[in-house]
């Protein structure tokens, strides 16, 4: 670290929805010559993932209360006090010029101590319904940013920071116009798999006449791939040219860009990535998401005719098959264009600029 080098501390943890957008901003700031240090939980996924990106870490132990037992609730005051003390120690060691909170339980004690120590705090909320931590910290932050309009009062709509390759794909009009033959459908279950999609999609395809069936790439997660194969076999399909079953996808930008339609859950980053690429989507929100935020995430696109939202309780093979029969590449291309128009492809740069400005830095450093 040079005497003139500025430092950003990113605090985020718990889930990829918090960590990955934080990494996008971290790399953008590093490219502009900033030093970046990450504050996270040693037991969280960030402790494994972030060091692989060459970013040093500070650790604070703190967990949430949702779904926890009486013992956790009774020990909360002690655990919170300890986490605040650990956070203060990290802030004193790192001496950041600005702190960016991307969400997760760890953000609360660290965010409070950032504000009390007089350092500028920038918050970013990825979901359409803000979590409790960000609702509280928004009152202490210098700048509050949101991925979806209205998630927090008096916030700036920047969108979600995403990987650069997703923000620079070919426009949907050109992609869709160059294709012929059956529709290309991408089904994304994520690393955890999505049992409802894994069960319903094969049965829906079986209800379609051979000439109506799309080409399908179905991703289900390593732990669920064998069950998925069994579901397709039970529906009368053998994996082949028109049905590819994969445990994971290395290049999501290419997978999204090759699809006419994506069938998936509606986590914040998934919705943002689909809009950035510009691809039609049928969202089936995870029904047990906190505050049902996946429904409102999906509604942001669905209400504009840029996607279709089907609740899991309403999803059936018959409904999906009927809906697919009514789609054409032209109708899906229109949906994709609407989706692309709602994207914020410059979100990573915008969040980085806000952080720089909060630290009193020259924004030209991020051009």
From Swiss-Prot:
Reaction it catalyzes: di-trans,octa-cis-undecaprenyl diphospho-N-acetyl-alpha-D-muramoyl-L-alanyl-D-glutamyl-meso-2,6-diaminopimeloyl-D-alanyl-D-alanine + UDP-N-acetyl-alpha-D-glucosamine = di-trans,octa-cis-undecaprenyl diphospho-[N-acetyl-alpha-D-glucosaminyl-(1->4)]-N-acetyl-alpha-D-muramoyl-L-alanyl-D-glutamyl-meso-2,6-diaminopimeloyl-D-alanyl-D-alanine + UDP + H(+)
Keyword Transcription regulation in annotation: no
Domain of life of the source: Bacteria
Record-linked Pfam families: Glyco_tran_28_C (PF04101), Glyco_transf_28 (PF03033)
GO biological process: carbohydrate metabolic process; cell division; cell wall organization; lipid glycosylation; peptidoglycan biosynthetic process; regulation of cell shape
Enzyme nomenclature, EC number: 2.4.1.227
Localization of this protein: Cell inner membrane
Residue numbers binding UDP-N-acetyl-alpha-D-glucosamine: 15-17, 127, 163, 191, 249, 294
GO molecular function: UDP-N-acetyl-D-glucosamine:N-acetylmuramoyl-L-alanyl-D-glutamyl-meso-2,6-diaminopimelyl-D-alanyl-D-alanine-diphosphoundecaprenol 4-beta-N-acetylglucosaminlytransferase activity; undecaprenyldiphospho-muramoylpentapeptide beta-N-acetylglucosaminyltransferase activity
Protein name listed in UniProt: UDP-N-acetylglucosamine--N-acetylmuramyl-(pentapeptide) pyrophosphoryl-undecaprenol N-acetylglucosamine transferase
Native organism: Burkholderia cenocepacia (strain ATCC BAA-245 / DSM 16553 / LMG 16656 / NCTC 13227 / J2315 / CF5610)
Lineage, uppermost ranks: Bacteria, Pseudomonadati, Pseudomonadota, Betaproteobacteria, Burkholderiales
This protein's encoding gene: murG
